[in-house]
Amino acid sequence: MRTISAQEITNTVARLCIEANTRLPADVEAALAKARQEEPWQLARNTLDLLWSNLSAAKEADLPICQDTGMACVFVELGTDVHIEGSFEAAIHEGVRRGYTDGYLRKSIVADPLRRGNTGDNTPAAITVHLVDGEGCRITVAPKGFGSENMSRILMLKPADGVEGFKKFVVDTVKLAGSNPCPPIVLGIGVGGSFDKVAYLAKKALLRPLDVPNPDPYYAQLEQELLAAINQLGIGPQGFGGRTTCLGLSIEQMPTHVAGLPVAVNVSCHVTRRASAEL
C-alpha cells in the first residue's frame, strides 16, 4: 500500500492548471505547425500565422493562451493500492483554487447554473476518477473553454442509422458549429454505451494525443475518413475559409444495447489544453 498526501495532490493540480493554460500539448502544437505549412489558402495561412504568434507570445510571457481559461476538468487514474492521506476531492479543488489564483487565470465558474453567482476561484472542478490496478496515480488537468463546449452535441441514433448515420451526425455537428468554436477545431467522439457514458467517451477522446490513432484499425480508418470529410467543408481557420477546419479527432467506443446507437461529439478549439503528471 502506498500513501499519497492530500498536499501533494493539491500542489500537483495547481501546477498543472497553470501549465495547461500557458502551454499547448506537443501534439496539438505540432498539428497547428503542420497546418501552417500545408494550408493552400492565403487568408487561412495568415490566420494560422496569427494563432501561432499568439501561442508563441503566451509561451514567452508565461501567460494564458486564451482569455477563456476554462472549466477545470480533472481526470485521475488512481491505483487501488493507493491510500490518500486527507480528503481527495477537497485536495483537487484546493489545487484548482490555488492554480487559478496564482496563475492569474480567469475565474469562470458559477455556483448554480440558473442563479449564476460566480464562485470567484474557478471551483468546483469537474472530477473523473478511474480506478486501475497498482500503486500509481496519474492526474490530468484539461481546462475546457465553453465557446467550443457549447457547440458539442449528443444524439441517440437508431441502430439502422449505422456507420453512415454516425458519420453524418459528426460532420453535421461541425457544419452547424461553423466559426463559433474558434476553428481549427479538435473533436472528441464517443460512440456506444448509454446516454451518460457516451458523453464521457467523447470527453475522454480529447485526452488522447492527436498522433495516436484508435488501436482498433476499423475506428482508426473512421478517424481518417471523418477528418478528411470535415476538412472538405471549407470552414477554415476562424471561419475565413480554407482546408484547415479540424486539426485532428479521436473516437472512443464501448459496447451498447442492441436497441441503441448513442453518439456524442465534444467540440474543442485550436487551444485544446491538457497537462498530466504521475505521482
Predicted regions mapped to residue ranges:
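Non-transmembrane, aqueous-exposed alpha-helical and coiled segments at domain scale
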Residues: 1-189, 194-279
